UniProtKB/Swiss-Prot annotation:
This is Protein flp. The chain crosses the membrane at residues 6-26, 389-409, 433-453, 471-491. It comes from Staphylococcus aureus (strain COL). Its precise function is unknown. Has no penicillin-binding activity and is not involved in methicillin resistance. Gene3D superfamilies: DD-peptidase/beta-lactamase superfamily. Keywords: Cell membrane, Membrane, Transmembrane, Transmembrane helix.
Length: 498
């Protein structure tokens, strides 16, 4: 009898472990798929879930992979009051994602020999000077690019910088002689003023306004014909209305802004135009390849910045995951652009509300699209295995029924005095071992989203998981604990001899 019990216990554990491993392997199958209509529906569910959670009125989403547009779509409203729906042509203020254009422009001027990255800022902006510990310090163009100039992040909130200082020259004069937080080149500190100064350098070197140079040198050649720079709070036909939350209700917001912040924060564009920018970043023409690659190279480490190892020329970088990205936030807009040049895909999310759910949405889309280097979308891949998951569901349901029948029969036997309870140290040890194994397997099931997808939990996964997979997982979990009950009953009961 003891041998049979041990055999039964071993077989039960092996079956449960095998099923769990099978599910894990199936989820991790090395399958590559492109976004289908079905997978786009799954992505729609994810996007709508996050937009609803963040109370975001409207957003436009772009996904480009291998040079092809997989998704370019608007969600919600660009204007809630007028019921104007968001679309790929809706223009948003992209905030700090403007910096990548400024950074690339500086690198191009350096490539052309019109400036040197090691030039002192004062060479191109003669009136500019700042101090550290009371002594005048030299700041280089490269240090502005790398955000290591030592210029305080909050320098433009000082009283000396007012709405009257609305030109780049004026604002740099207003801060002239101010104290740096750090000695130039020693420490990363993110400051819009670094890129505003780069914009002024572009103006002085090219003898054109910053906006004119960027438009003629980059936007027009890239066919970004509807991209512009914010000049007023007036909104045209395709411009999204910006909102701020009051409680959980978005209300129209038109905050004051400064034109001198244009090189770091005030480009206005759409996902339709950014499609060209993303394709250019991922697959640049030969004459620009080295320039784009240089713009993605680390210039400074960014200790303390979430998900980033370093800062490049207007981009944060994550070397571990080969990501190049930047967020953008204003009082009433937010944006996020993520690139993976190695795997050749990019994600853009533009929204007309400043919301923490914009970077979360990008993370969720990134998880779906690449899923750690294997396939384009998790949901699309899973749908290919519906039949296998249905088989798992049938097997688990059968196991549950058998466990129920066995338990019911054992209960009937106990009621009629046909079995006795058994107690021994060996049985206690086996019982605890079975319990521990079942708990461990349950924890593995609980941790599957993190183990497979990187950083998601079940509450998120269940919003898009196909019903076949949900049933397979639920029945597996129930079967796991049903098997535990059967094992415990088998170990702790003994049929009386008649």
């Amino acid at each position: 009898m003891t041998t049979k019990k041990l055999y039964f216990l071993s077989i039960s554990i092996i079956i449960i472990v095998a099923i769990s491993i099978a599910i894990y392997i199936t989820l991790n199958s090395n399958t590559k798929t492109r976004l289908t209509n079905d997978s786009q529906q799954q992505i729609d569910t994810i996007i709508e879930h996050d937009l609803q959670k963040g109370h975001i009125p409207g957003a436009s989403i772009l996904i480009v992979k291998n040079g092809k547009v997989f998704l370019n779509k608007g969600y919600g409203y660009q204007d809630v009051d007028k019921k104007v729906k968001a679309s790929p042509t809706t223009k948003y203020e992209i905030a700090s994602n403007t910096k990548a254009f400024t950074g690339l422009a500086i690198l191009k001027l350096a490539q052309e020999g019109r400036l040197n990255l090691n030039d002192a800022v004062s060479k191109h902006v003669p009136h500019f000077k700042m101090n550290y510990n009371g002594q005048n310090e030299t700041i280089t163009i490269k240090q502005l690019l790398a955000q290591t100039s030592g210029i305080p992040s909050d320098i433009t909130s000082e009283d000396s910088v007012t709405s009257k200082n609305n030109r780049l020259n004026d604002v740099t004069r207003a801060i002239m002689g101010d104290e740096l937080h750090h000695k130039p080149g020693e420490e990363f500190e993110y400051s819009n003023m670094n890129y505003d100064l780069l914009g002024l350098i572009i103006q002085n070197v090219t003898k054109q306004s910053y906006t004119k140079y960027i438009t003629n040198s980059w936007l027009k050649p890239l066919h970004m014909t509807h991209t512009s720079f914010k000049q007023t709070n007036y909104k045209s036909k395709h411009d999204a209305i910006g909102y701020e939350l009051q409680g959980s209700t978005p209300v129209v917001s038109k905050p004051e802004f400064n034109l001198w912040d244009t090189p770091s924060a005030y480009m206005m564009t759409s996902t339709e135009d950014l499609e060209h920018w993303i394709k250019f970043q991922l697959n640049p023409p030969d004459k620009y390849k080295s320039l784009v690659q240089q713009s993605h190279k680390n210039l400074s480490s960014t200790i303390g910045e979430p998900n980033a190892n370093a800062y490049a020329s207007g981009w944060f970088t994550n070397n571990d995951e080969h990501l190049v990205f930047h967020s953008g936030t204003l009082d009433n807009f937010s944006s996020f652009i993520l690139l993976n040049p190695k795997q050749n895909y990019g994600i853009v999310v533009l929204a007309n509300l400043n919301s923490e759910y914009v970077p979360k949405l990008v993370e969720h889309l990134n998880t779906q699209i690449v899923n750690h280097k294997r396939y384009s979308t998790v949901a699309s891949m899973l749908n290919q295995y519906k039949d296998q998951f249905n088989i798992v569901t049938v097997l688990m349901t059968t196991l549950i029924l058998l466990a129920f029948i066995f338990s019911a029969y054992r209960a009937w036997q106990m009621r009629h005095g046909q079995i006795l309870l058994r107690r021994s140290k060996r049985i206690a040890v086996l019982s605890w071992l079975s319990l521990c194994i079942c708990i461990a397997l349950a924890l593995i099931l609980y941790a599957l989203p993190y183990l497979i997808l990187g950083s998601n939990n079940w509450s998120f996964v269940l919003t898009w998981l196909p019903i076949e997979i949900k049933l397979a997982l639920i029945t597996t979990l129930i079967a796991l604990f049903s098997t535990l009950i059967v094992i415990l009953l088998f170990l702790h009961t003994k049929i009386t001899k008649t």
